[in-house]
Amino acid sequence: MITRRSFLGSAAGLALTPGVRAAESAKKKLAVVTNIWNYRSHAWHMAERFLHGYPIGGAWHHPPFEVVSAYVDQKPEGDLSAARAKEFGFTIYPTVEEALRRGGKQLAVDAVLVIGEHGTYPKTEFGQIQYPRYEYFKKITGVYKADGRTAPVFNDKHLSWKFAWAKEMVDLSKGMKFGFCAGSSLPVTWRMPAVDLPFGAEVEEAMCVSNGALDIYDFHNLEAIQCMVERRKGGETGVVAVQAFKGDDVWKHVSQGDWGKELFGACLSRSHTLAQAPTLSHRMPTWDQMKEWVKEPVAYRVEYADGLKTTMMLMNGLVSDFTFAAKLKGDPKPLSTLFHLPPTPNVTYSAALMSKAEETFLTGKSPTPIERTLLTSGITEAGLQSLKKGQRLETPHLAVKYQVGKESTFARE
């Protein structure tokens, strides 16, 4: 695990290297593959951490990587890729393959950062944006196969909008034996309070409440839930069914206590953005107020193979943050926390995520389980399909089993 001490050590080592040019040449080479590179896009938030560094533990860290190439799929108005390439001296290539080979005939980078988010892409009938993450990955691994060498890969957010493709990506990474890290910033950002699910705890019910759009924030919400419940007794057992709800059905199940009424209350009590009526100070809203403010609540009810049930809730108009609560066996009080997302423009939670990408690039191993994001990618797909079809969906294909270590991996400094 990368720590402040190791960050400062690497930065100090670079500072002692004679000559800036020599220090740069000693750095590992990084290729960026991204949909777009615009202001406040994920490339702007994440790839640029490897251009000018980022804060960690009260110090400014400069990763021992040099961005040497990029592929930018779309260049809408406001594109910043050319300006960044000129400022930092990297080359933008017309294809993924050329970016990885840097115009030559062999793989010429030590790591690949994939950011398949934002841009204009078609949607499926279920509202899934068909971002080309799988297509990027296949081109990357095509280079690896042809050139007889691999490099670690970080993939931002979902693996793919199609679970079969997501599974193929994971299987390929394991078969070719290269480090593969992916997912949301939610599991690795700061928490208030800084708690984790006790390792090996028996979990009866869990919930995360947030705002946001479908196929975007539902994934973040599910990643927040999964990074907690995967620590439960027996480890991850996979998901057997998903059912989506919206509108009055959500309020009915919450108010009747079907989904853990006390967990909903704990989540709202952890929120820093809980909506209030005009002129009122911080109060717990009434059910009538919540129904008035949240025009169309959405929930995914997720059933796990070991009997655990979790609820993903999108409550636009009620909150603008992510809060989690869980009922642990033998504990009358829910475990609860806020996943803290520092504000724009700096959004330093992306720095926390890029520290995991950097660790993957340096060690060749992901510090977080790729199976987590495989599973959450599949739950997101199932949730959107259930919402469209209006029925519970059994998910035998989501029998994703894995174990995590005892050590926590979220930001604390």
What are these regions (language model features)?
Residues 8, 47, 51, 82, ...:
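Non-transmembrane alpha-helical segments in soluble domains
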Residues 12, 22-151, 161, 165-168, ...:
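N-terminal glycine-/serine-/threonine-rich beta1-alpha1-beta2 phosphate-ribose binding loop
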Residues 138, 148-229:
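A contiguous active-site-proximal alpha/beta segment in oxidoreductase catalytic domains
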